[in-house]
Amino acid sequence: MIDYKNTLNLPETGFPMRGDLAKREPDMLKNWYDKNLYQKVRESSKGKKSFILHDGPPYANGNIHIGHAVNKILKDIIMKSKTALGFDTPYVPGWDCHGLPIELKVEGIVGKPNEKISAAEFRQACRDYAKEQVEGQKADFIRMGILGDWDNPYLTMNFDTEAHIIRTLGKVIANGHLYKGSKPVHWCLDCGSSLAEAEVEYEDKVSPSIYVRFKAVDSVAVEAKFNAVGKGSGQISAVIWTTTPWTLPSNKAISINPEFDYQLVQFGGERVVLVKDLVESVQKAVGIESVEVLGEVKGDALELMQFQHPFYDYSVPLILGDHVTTDGGTGLVHTAPDHGQDDFVVSKKYNIEMAGLVANDGKFISSTPFFAGLGVFESNEKVLEKLKEVGALLKLERIKHSYPHCWRHKTPIIFRATPQWFIGMETQGLREQALGEIKSVRWIPSWGEARIDTMVANRPDWCISRQRTWGVPMTMFVHNETEELHPRTLEILESVAKRVEEKGIQAWWDLDPVEVLGEEDAKNYRKVPDTLDVWFDSGSTYASVVEARPEFNGNSTDMYLEGSDQHRGWFMSSLMLSTATNGKAPYKQVLTHGFVVDEKGRKMSKSLGNVIVPSEVWNKNGADILRLWVASTDYTGEIAVSHNILNSAGESYRRIRNTARFLLANLNGFDPKRDLVKPEEMIALDRWAVSCALEAQNDIKEAYDNYQFHTVVQRLMRFCSIEMGSFYLDIIKDRQYTTKADSLARRSCQTALWHIAEALVRWMAPILSFTADEIWSYLPQVEGRSEFVFTEEFYEGLFGLTEADKLDDAYWQQILKVRAESNRVLEQARKDKVIGSGLEAKVTLYANNEIRAMLEQLGNELRFVLITSQAIIKPLSEADVAEGEMAGLAVKVERAEGEKCPRCWHFATDIGTHTEHSSVCGRCVENVAGEGEKRSFA
């Protein structure tokens, strides 16, 4: 008896069913490194139009978290997809290496500078620590399959980068944007330094909430202003509200809004001045049963009226400020120019000087009456006691409210006026110019434009100086008496930059001023001791990296991509510096992603036990699962992750992998050079399948080009699961396995599968990089083929249907609907035990004229599309079963006629009619012993 199994073309491939990614990926990474994959990608793209995504530098401290993974994977998907779209995509990863967090870590190891260790040794310890942190993070980024110039990253502590940062400072000075002044800045008592806006977090804090009386210096004059002479009784006070009693010793004025209506009100046994709109709310807060309005006047009429400071022997004026609102309080704002930005600005208009009572350590200086030596927060209670003692405290409560905290120490900070260096927002029209540049940028998502526009419109001048040890120095000299910059500052900066380029920032601290100033000037000028804000470091990388490194060929940056918190961080600092130095934005597009939360929308937290550690994911599931999860998510909002969500990504991965494996297994023995069938000679269904792939590719390319990666994944899944998995790949199994190995019927099918596989692997590569690389190695080899899929552009061998194709896409879409209806009835027949599998069925399709004419075009091949042994078409009028879910069609299922063929498993009535092959059907006889069956459609 003949063993017909050997006559079948059974699928065969070495491509494993299981990904086993956690085990295989490291070997692939080694191969990529050994073969210098990144350089191969660069070489393959030489001469093409560039696309530059400038890497925002993560801070070189600690292990990477899931947010880092999202950020770097999104960047990698963009770079790989841009390569496939025909761009040259240099990618230089970077790290932010200076600043306080590293200082604090190093202090814990070696002690504070100039105590147990010299400042120079401390800086070297910081450099060594940062280098170690970079190496750890770098290994993790590489493990995720991120391609880049990992052997030559940019570090803000590289000597050449430090020198370029100094040169950027020089350009800021040259363009007239730098000034020195005493202004209130965010000040961390633990850091002993100012903080950037982006280094401030808001947390809940319990504070005293107090209403305070400032007695009128001249009650009669106040009565007269309110046209209320002789009205009411008791002392007259202006009432302010504050949650920072410690700032009252520095009070120099009370601000009111010139446009608001203010009232003199009888409050029990006293008279108070309040804004009209808040009288009722203050009455309730203070607990006064009844009030009487004695007079009313516009705020501007009260300008410069004098009121007595609650506990110091001086009076303070009422001054006018637009910052005063009726959102809360009393409409009269306690104004301490040392401790608030609005306070400072409005006081400056009236030439009101700052008090200067709080030292760097957050304690009141020794000359401060009543509070000398006390820390500011410690002094709150003492101030309250003093207010009670002098009868100035109208009301005291304790409230929980949002208060600024240091991002690193998590402790409350203060506003404090100190001599600092600033980039002026109004100087040389910087604010207006930056606002104009924002409009020239494409913001993704679009709401990013309004967000940064508001921030730039309202931000204060940028304090760029810090009082730290580990940072790029502000390499300037100021006159000992006048504090003016040296007249040769720009020349000196360049001279110092060259030294830093050779020896790093320590060259500045070791520099003898005589070397650059000469003997005489060295006596009259001193070094500025400050370092630059780390946001200046990273904000100037458009110059220190993109403009400076040769691989960027002088091209400007196309994209910045970071988390949405960077509107006030890196996007902002980069915009300010680039506009100040180059007169334009440093980027053409800015893409932001949301923060990672758990499946319930909660932040990642150890206490909640919902933290997903990236390394645990790739060690268990593989990095491709992490990459697929990132790509599957709409990154414009919050990005949800959990073990369940990752498991779901794993299921999607398996569907894609199974599709790829089916393609590879059925390309067994296929040599494109020898076996490829011309499009016009291919079977109709195969041509349609290739046209489906072309349509999918067009959708996928458009989605990649618009950074809509979740759309890419959805389209990829639809193609694998619906168009291929549940239709085309299902139908072709019979033809692929049972027809002659070298027949047109089979080679046509393999040609389609090969085109589809060549396209599919390229679609996957930006997202499922490891799996795409693995698939690439199993595809049939062709002459001149690249070693890696990552050097390839999207596949150009796909083709669409033409006018010559009678069975067009609309036709096959209708066939899909007929098949869905047939499957529905077959499934019911299976449940009713009429049949076991579809091949045990004979289906009769009762169709209206239109559907009948369509189905008849397939002739005897309709049964292959329906995957039944027999298929008969009859007029709908003859139906003895009801129409189903498709109008104009009724499907009847019966058991197939004849016997089951052991070779093809179809039921046939001609088994036993062939002498030599009596056990198989006539079709199989033709495929085994004859010229092979002919197929035209399916």
UniProtKB/Swiss-Prot annotation:
It comes from Actinobacillus pleuropneumoniae serotype 7 (strain AP76). Binds 1 zinc ion per subunit. Keywords: Aminoacyl-tRNA synthetase, ATP-binding, Cytoplasm, Ligase, Metal-binding, Nucleotide-binding, Protein biosynthesis, Zinc. A motif ('HIGH' region) lies at residues 58-68. It is found in: Cytoplasm. InterPro entries: aa-tRNA-synth_I_CS (IPR001412), aa-tRNA-synth_Ia (IPR002300), Anticodon_Ile_BEm (IPR033708), Ile-tRNA-ligase (IPR002301), Ile-tRNA-ligase_type1 (IPR023585), Ile-tRNA_ligase (IPR050081), M/V/L/I-tRNA-synth_anticd-bd (IPR013155), Rossmann-like_a/b/a_fold (IPR014729). PANTHER family: ISOLEUCINE--TRNA LIGASE, MITOCHONDRIAL, SOLEUCYL-TRNA SYNTHETASE. GO terms for biological process: isoleucyl-tRNA aminoacylation. L-isoleucyl-5'-AMP binds at residue 562. IleRS has two distinct active sites: one for aminoacylation and one for editing. The misactivated valine is translocated from the active site to the editing site, which sterically excludes the correctly activated isoleucine. The single editing site contains two valyl binding pockets, one specific for each substrate (Val-AMP or Val-tRNA(Ile)). A motif ('KMSKS' region) lies at residues 603-607. Its EC number is 6.1.1.5. This is Isoleucine--tRNA ligase. Belongs to the class-I aminoacyl-tRNA synthetase family. IleS type 1 subfamily. Its cofactor is Zn(2+). Coiled coil: none annotated. Catalyzes the attachment of isoleucine to tRNA(Ile). As IleRS can inadvertently accommodate and process structurally similar amino acids such as valine, to avoid such errors it has two additional distinct tRNA(Ile)-dependent editing activities. One activity is designated as 'pretransfer' editing and involves the hydrolysis of activated Val-AMP. The other activity is designated 'posttransfer' editing and involves deacylation of mischarged Val-tRNA(Ile). Monomer. The keyword Nucleotide-binding applies. Its main location: cytoplasm.
